[in-house]
Amino acid sequence: MLPPTVLAASVLKDPLTLFLAGLSLLVLFLWYFATDYEARKRNIGTVLLVGICALCALAIYPPKDNLKGGIDLVGGSSFTLLVKPKIDEVTLQPIPLTKDDLKQARATIEKRVNAYGNIDMLAVEQGTDKILLQMPGMAPEESAAIKELLQKVARLELKEVNLEGGVPGSDGRPLAERIHTGDEPRVPGFKVYEQKYKNEDGTELSTYLLLNNRSALTGKDVQQAWPDSMAGGHSVSINLTNAGADKMIALTKDMTPGRDRIAVVLDGEVITAPVVQSVPLGKRFQIEGQDSQEEARSLANAMMNPLENPLEIIEERTISPTLGAAVVKQGMWSGIMGLCITAVFVLIYYRTAGLVALFGLLVNGLLIFGGMAMFNFTFTLAGIAGMILSIGMAVDANVLIYERLREEIAAGKSLKTAINAAYEKAFTAIFDSNLTSLITAVILYWMGSSSIKGFAITLTIGILASMFSAILVTRVLFRWCNDLNLLKKLSFLDLIKASKIDFLSKSKLAYVISGLLVAASVGAVAMRGENSMGIDFTGGSLVEFQLGEEKSLSQPEVEKALAGIQVSKRPIVQVEKSITGELVTIRCATGDADKIAAHLRGSFDILGEKETEDGKDRYVIEQSTQGVSATLGKDFLIDSAIALALGLLGILTYITIRFEFSFALGGFIALLHDVVLSAGLVILIGGELSLIHVGALLTIAGYSINDTIVIFDRIRESLKSGEGDVKELMNEAINATLSRTILTSLTTIVTVGIIAIFGGSALKDFSVMILIGLVIGTYSSVFIASPVVLWWSQRKGGSLRKEVLHTSLAESDIQAIR
């Protein structure tokens, strides 16, 4: 009998059970915010907390099955795919491959295998006719499904059936069958296809059809394909594009209902050839006969991403992690150390309230890991570092609440009243800052490539977990403490005293400093050119040494040997295993390939060993070198730029609605400033931009806008309630949030700094950029964003106070959902 936890986890794999559980929790969530009765709100919140935590825990259990590591952590499988030429429909001759064919095949593979961005995979063009695909470790059934999906061309064609092919000859056999057996000559412009089917007792039979060589419609005319259940079986429903619908009408308008037929051909096989029942046909039809819903889903996925050229898996290998075990362990421990230091700081600074915050952070972590397990995400080291960072940043919401709580207690309010007031006043800042990040995440998912989609889902899970743990979890815990009289009073350290700094008067100096830094960054990019981009962006060469079954080299040995060589770009080393033995591969810049190969032959005897053949010396272990494409090409950069631009536009629109256009402009310029400087300064200090930096930049963008919104929220509050000069009120608001700004930045910088120092080279690039972004983001929120708001409002001659009052949403609109 299965253990209860395993049984419960297996039950939750059922979609209906998961849907009902989610629906129940949603009802509780809405009920929690709808009720005003404190005791009821406390009880509903408790049930909701326990339910969501239980759901996440069961999604994670057992961790070894549900928390899957990426290529960098656990290695995986490597497939070498041969891209075959397609056949000309008229001449039936192979069409030579082009670079565009290889590019299309690679893009299609990425969309098929990683449509949601939840898998850590690598796909690069190799040579002139191959694609190298690497994926994290998979179960045998998953590997078999991936292989089938990779080689399924899903080339859909609709062809007119020549009815003469069914006319029987003197021997009683139809014309199409006699052509197939060679007893009749071919009919020009037509080709014989075999259609397989099963009779009533399950015996497989064949019939032959004479079809037009030219396809009336192809997969390019498919707008949408999805699995559909039908009585007695499964099918794939297809919607055609407008152009495809026009072709279908042109094909069928002159047909005779009840007589003429159309054949649906998939990958050269006739799936069905129904008799047309009415004319003309329109946009939608079905392909029937799939044996299971999963088969129908796989076919629909392939048809939405059809290959122009057939693929063949010519080699499969097991690959080592791109990071060694010691490096992975080092990175993990550094992250845990950073979080522990943050936890100790929160406990010392906020004391009893710090315990409540830590409980909220533990729930936050559980929700993030549970969400990742539910979406079947693979965990990379950078992803884990990003989650550690997001948990560290989740401290921000607690700091916001506690700094408000400090103010309310200082104003002489009772503890219960002070707690309620603190949550009420901090809510708008938490809501606005998280919602702007959520807008960005949605747009990134909608517009981005698979890698960007993965980041967007991770960001969304982190945002929702952070809001839930800060607003609901800690609030419920405080309610229990109050109702059970466990909490008599709260005290905090007060290391950051109230200040009266005139930040806005220093804006001109800040503009000069930022201008010089931007100029230096742009200059560094211009001077270094392509050298500022890593292999992920530029592509390069793949150097391979086939060691065979008797010889071996470890990944750390090769990496250590390459550490002492001067190269233009950092190489990426992997050790792969196949039935022919070990293979050492190095992805490097094209100009570094020969230098790296020579250095390795001089460093390892097994690579430098020679033998004499026909009077000539040759290496026992030969090397092969061939070009590989960028893992992040121009399309990725264009998609990312468009997604980021739309995300900025979404933020601009939201801040304009919630605040005023002056605030939107200030936030936009500060965000752009932070992203440009973070990337530019990394290049300026000699770094190379790679895939890991893309995630870092997106994280910085989210942190930056979050920091800015918190200050904007306090400025808005001051303008609504305070009298006096606008500039003075803005300075007071910035000073009021200074303790929160410093505390949040400090805790996050400590966490990331420890990862940078002790996390090893694997995490150095990621954490250094994050550190730069944190410092710049904190600086710009105070010295760039707010001064731009004041400058723009003064430039157009309006009253910022009146504009805020007119354009802000009514507080009751937000209060209603608390």
What are these regions (language model features)?
Residues 29-38, 46, 50-76, 80-92, ...:
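Transmembrane helices with small-residue packing motifs
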Residues 29-43, 237, 241-258, 262-263, ...:
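Interfacial segments of transmembrane alpha-helices in multi-pass membrane proteins
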Residues 45-56, 355-376, 387-394, 455-470, ...:
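Small-residue-enriched core segments of transmembrane alpha-helices in multipass membrane transport
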Residues 89-275, 285, 634, 654:
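Non-transmembrane, solvent-exposed regions of membrane trafficking/translocation machinery
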Residues 109, 322-340, 393, 413-449, ...:
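Pore- and gate-forming transmembrane helices of large, multi-pass membrane proteins
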Residues 205-319, 326-327, 331-332, 556-621, ...:
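Extracytoplasmic
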Residues 370, 407-428, 432-517, 758-818:
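Hydrophobic alpha-helical transmembrane segments of membrane transport and translocation systems
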Residues 392-433, 479-486, 687-744, 790-805:
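Cytosolic juxtamembrane regions of multi-pass inner-membrane proteins
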